[in-house]
């Protein structure tokens, strides 16, 4: 599809059929039927914690020892084992070698835990065997370690079990956040006065990311670019909307499922497979097709944006949680809440401004990045912690890093700076938690929210309860550690409109 300077979604979609209407229960039923004798659990390696924002009531791990997987595989909600487990790897903040090592460790430990569970089941007289599927969850704007991460997962599975991956299904779409794929091209939807318009993702600020920049919006060409030609664009299987919607709006979803499975029949040796997605029904049609392909014997891995898992397991869209639901089962404290803003993308800066403008009772504490990187950083952080703790006694605190992003031409150096800043934020959060626990914690930005969860709040196991806004921004309930009982809000840097951060804060605050 040619890329034009100005595109309208309605015009682009006019070339394709209408969506196939598919209830979530249809997908859940297909999954249940195939898992009757051998339950399948998706292990989602989430390169930052914002991948959970589209799902609800699933276990989340920030550590991945075999014992952690054993807890997750056995955790039951309403008496049933869950269909997916999220593992917060935080690999988007790591260099390639570190990211590969972490992916391998997670996969090996997950497979070991599944073997232990299968052995225990057989010993108890049951015949069921846990099957694992693996999902590499990454950014809906195409940033992250691709193809390194799916390559590593596939190689580890082959080394441990001998199973060879036939195809890697690439689905970055996130319609709730305005990211859609049409005709094999990935777009961002316009907002406000630009509503209805589409911008190819390579023309956005995200394509200029210091660590993970890219030049192509057409996913087949993106694959060729990122694989340095190992996968040619013309070798990529494209599941466009003609295939995803083959059944038509009133047709049998099985028609679409068969068309999808037929289209990827030739996949072998980790063939890249990209999929068009515009609506939730498209996710469900794709899920049925992938289930059919796997039933036929195809071995697939997934490289996806946040909502893919919801569609793949047939989970209903969870309505946005209220403030009362966020505190359900826990008595909120009278202290202020802590809003931590680390992301530097444009939408986050606008959201921060809107929150500061509207929340006049909040105290603003800034971590100056230049001051942090030079001089007495320890003494500087002592003062920051003191300011935060004192302010929490009577107000919400907005803790943010200075908005001037320090960039270099060296991707590794950019990551090092990002990690130094994140470590400082984590130290402030952790010392605050142990001195004067806040009413709630919101973390804005992927790397920020990951480090705040695992190190600042010392969360090891959590349950994602659902979104705070429709389809975006997830609430985690820590089930252990010093943050147990404190609502933790994971807020991606690149989602929401200018008012979203203020809206979430207003739901949780007692002073806003």
Predicted regions and their residues:
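Short acidic, glycine/serine/threonine-rich loops at helix termini
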Residues: 54-58, 145-149, 179-190, 284-289, ...
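A structural-propensity feature for long, helix-poor, extended segments
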Residues: 78-91, 392-393, 475-512
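Short, flexible loop segments at boundaries between secondary-structure elements
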Residues: 304-334, 465-489, 493
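A glycine- and small/hydrophobic-rich beta-loop-beta segment
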Residues: 325-427
């Amino acid at each position: 599809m040619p890329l034009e300077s100005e595109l309208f979604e309605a015009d682009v979609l006019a070339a394709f059929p209408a969506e196939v209407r598919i209830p979530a229960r249809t997908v859940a039923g297909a999954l249940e039927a195939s898992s009757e004798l051998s339950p399948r659990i998706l292990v989602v390696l989430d390169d930052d914690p914002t991948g959970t924002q589209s799902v609800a009531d699933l276990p989340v791990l920030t550590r991945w020892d075999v014992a952690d997987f054993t807890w997750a595989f056995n955790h039951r909600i309403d008496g049933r084992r869950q269909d997916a487990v999220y593992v917060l790897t935080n690999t988007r903040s790591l260099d390639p070698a570190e990211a590969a090592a972490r992916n391998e460790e997670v996969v090996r430990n997950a497979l070991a835990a599944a073997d232990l569970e299968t052995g225990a089941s057989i010993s108890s007289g049951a015949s069921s065997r846990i099957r694992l599927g693996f999902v590499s969850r990454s950014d809906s704007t195409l940033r992250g370690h691709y193809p390194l991460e799916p390559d590593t997962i596939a190689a580890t599975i082959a080394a441990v079990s001998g199973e060879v991956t036939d195809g890697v299904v690439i689905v970055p779409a996130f319609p709730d956040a305005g990211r859609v794929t049409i005709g094999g091209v990935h777009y961002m939807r316009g907002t406000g006065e630009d509503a209805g318009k589409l911008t190819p993702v390579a023309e956005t600020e995200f394509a200029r990311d210091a660590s993970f920049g890219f030049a192509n919006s057409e996913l087949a060409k993106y694959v060729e670019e990122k694989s340095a030609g190992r996968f040619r664009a013309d070798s990529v299987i494209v599941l466009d909307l003609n295939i995803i919607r083959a059944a038509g709006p009133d047709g049998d979803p099985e028609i679409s499922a068969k068309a999808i499975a037929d289209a990827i029949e030739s996949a072998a040796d980790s063939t890249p497979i990209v999929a068009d997605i515009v609506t939730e029904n498209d996710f469900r049609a794709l899920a049925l097709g992938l289930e059919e392909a796997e039933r036929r014997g195809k071995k697939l891995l997934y490289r996806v944006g946040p909502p893919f898992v919801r569609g793949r397991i047939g989970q209903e869209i969870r309505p946005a949680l209220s403030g009362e639901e966020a505190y359900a089962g826990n008595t909120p404290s009278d202290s202020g809440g802590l809003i931590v803003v680390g992301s530097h993308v444009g939408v986050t800066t606008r959201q921060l401004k809107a929150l500061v403008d509207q929340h006049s009772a909040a105290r603003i504490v800034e971590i100056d990045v230049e001051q942090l990187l030079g001089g007495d950083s320890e003494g500087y952080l002592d003062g920051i912690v003191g300011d935060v703790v004192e302010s929490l006694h009577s107000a919400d605190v907005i803790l943010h890093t200075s908005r001037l992003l320090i960039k270099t031409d060296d991707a590794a150096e950019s990551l090092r700076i990002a990690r130094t800043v994140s470590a400082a934020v984590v130290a402030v959060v952790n010392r605050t938690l142990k001195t004067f626990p806040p009413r709630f914690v919101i973390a804005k930005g992927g790397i920020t929210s990951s480090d705040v969860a695992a190190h600042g709040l010392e969360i090891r196991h959590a349950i994602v309860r659902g979104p705070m806004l429709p389809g975006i921004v997830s609430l985690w309930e820590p089930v252990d550690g010093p943050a147990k009982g404190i609502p933790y809000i994971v807020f991606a840097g690149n989602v929401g409109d200018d008012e979203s951060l203020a809206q979430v804060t207003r739901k949780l605050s007692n002073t806003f």
